[in-house]
Amino acid sequence: MVLKVKMGDIGVGKSPDSIETLLGSCVAIILYDRGKKIGGLAHIMLPKSRESDSKSPGKYADTAVPELLERLVKLGARRDKLVAKIAGGAAMFKANTNSIDVGKKNIDASKDELKKVGLRVSSEDTGGESGRTVVLSLKDGNVTIRKGNEVKNI
């Protein structure tokens, strides 16, 4: 089964399923426990939450990371065995050099939030100017990135 994660949402699952999302300036925060074959993906839209929006923890880097961790541990993942990867953060709307680069801010915030919980990004496919499709295979933890005709694994 393929679980499709929408903007601002979080998806978790077990082998043999996969988790997929489409990204522009948003970032996918991906965590995977290779031994248990359990993983998850948060599709964050913005770096920092506002207290008034506590109903959407997957929308922001600062709330998505702890929520994703909690859901994975409840599913049986071992926190000390989780591998972190990120993808996305494209500069989709580069009008001028003074424009706010939401993609870059999302990348930086994702790394910062993972670091706060003791996780280091093991690999990434971030930045650029085009969107991408991200697929996490829960069988083996491979993350496949598709950008146009280009396909690669991280």
Swiss-Prot record:
Superkingdom per UniProt: Archaea
Keywords: Chemotaxis, Hydrolase
Enzyme superclass (EC): hydrolase
InterPro entries: CheD-like_sf, Chemorcpt_Glu_NH3ase_CheD, Cytotoxic_necrot_fac-like_cat
Span of the signal peptide: none
Cystine connections: none
Gene3D superfamilies, alphabetized: 3.30.1330.200
Single Gene Ontology MF annotation: protein-glutamine glutaminase activity
Record function comment: Probably deamidates glutamine residues to glutamate on methyl-accepting chemotaxis receptors (MCPs), playing an important role in chemotaxis.
Similarity comment: family membership: Belongs to the CheD family.
Protein name, entry field: Probable chemoreceptor glutamine deamidase CheD
Organism whose genome encodes this protein: Methanococcus vannielii (strain ATCC 35089 / DSM 1224 / JCM 13029 / OCM 148 / SB)
Lineage start: Archaea, Methanobacteriati, Methanobacteriota, Methanomada group, Methanococci
Gene name per UniProt: cheD
